[in-house]
Every structure is written in C-alpha cells, then in structure tokens.
Amino acid sequence: MNLYTVIFINILLSLTLILVAFWLPQMNLYSEKANPYECGFDPTSSARLPFSMKFFLVAITFLLFDLEIALLLPLPWAIQTIKTSTMMIMAFILVTILSLGLAYEWTQKGLEWTE
C-alpha cells in the first residue's frame, strides 16, 4: 500500500465516524438528566458552585508546559540518530518555545496566584 492510499483510508474512516456520531444520538433532554447526582441522594448544596478562573488558567498552563516537557523525554534516544545536528536544533527550538511561553506567562502575571 502506498502512502496516499493509507492517508485516504484514514481520512475516509475519520469522516465516516464523525458523520455517524452526529447522526446517531437522539437528543432527548430530561429534567432528571440535568440534575446533579450525589451518590443516590439529593444534593446537600448547590452543584453550580463558582469556579475560580485563576485556578483554571493555571491548570491549563500546567497542562501545556507538561505536554512540552513530555515532548523532550525522547531526546536521549534521539541523540543516537545519524543527524545529531538536526535533532539538537529541533530540541533547541522546542526549549526556546517553552522558555518564551514561560517568560510570557511570567510577564503577564499568569503565574501569580493572588491578585
């Protein structure tokens, strides 16, 4: 199989699954489905508590930087490649992007917990 056939099959399968996912579900909204569930009992307090947006932004920032660090984990194995200079340039670019993102978050006070 050549590469174009594999790509075409992947795109076709993806589009088919997306279309089936949109057509299959029947959106029957019941009031019971919208109510919060707390271990079979009626909730003791409101389930719609305010959520700290600052916590959400710090959590998203952590996930982004954690993903970038996970991209650096294969570097020890990549050093064994034939094109070591290309690997080092790509690693340097990735670390630079990570550092610029951290500097931007720091200057915008995105890492400050209190305001």
UniProtKB/Swiss-Prot annotation:
Alphabetical keyword list: Electron transport, Membrane, Mitochondrion, Mitochondrion inner membrane, NAD, Respiratory chain, Translocase, Transmembrane, Transmembrane helix, Transport, Ubiquinone
InterPro entries: NADH_UbQ/plastoQ_OxRdtase_su3, NDAH_ubi_oxred_su3_sf
The keyword Membrane belongs to this UniProt entry's keyword annotation: yes
Entry's EC annotation: 7.1.1.2
Reactions it catalyzes: a ubiquinone + NADH + 5 H(+)(in) = a ubiquinol + NAD(+) + 4 H(+)(out)
Disulphide-bonded residues: none
One annotated Gene Ontology cellular component of this protein: mitochondrion
Cited Pfam families: Oxidored_q4 (PF00507)
Highest taxon above the source species: Eukaryota
Membrane-related topology note: Multi-pass membrane protein
Enzyme class: translocase
Signal peptide stretch: none
Compartmental location: Mitochondrion inner membrane
Transmembrane segments annotated in the record for this chain: 3-23, 55-75, 86-106
GO molecular function, a single term: NADH dehydrogenase (ubiquinone) activity
PANTHER family the record matches: NADH-UBIQUINONE OXIDOREDUCTASE CHAIN 3 (PTHR11058:SF9)
Family listed: Belongs to the complex I subunit 3 family.
Biological function: Core subunit of the mitochondrial membrane respiratory chain NADH dehydrogenase (Complex I) which catalyzes electron transfer from NADH through the respiratory chain, using ubiquinone as an electron acceptor. Essential for the catalytic activity of complex I.
Protein name: NADH-ubiquinone oxidoreductase chain 3
Annotated organism of origin: Mus musculus (Mouse)
Taxonomic path: Eukaryota, Metazoa, Chordata, Craniata, Vertebrata
Gene assigned in the entry: mt-Nd3
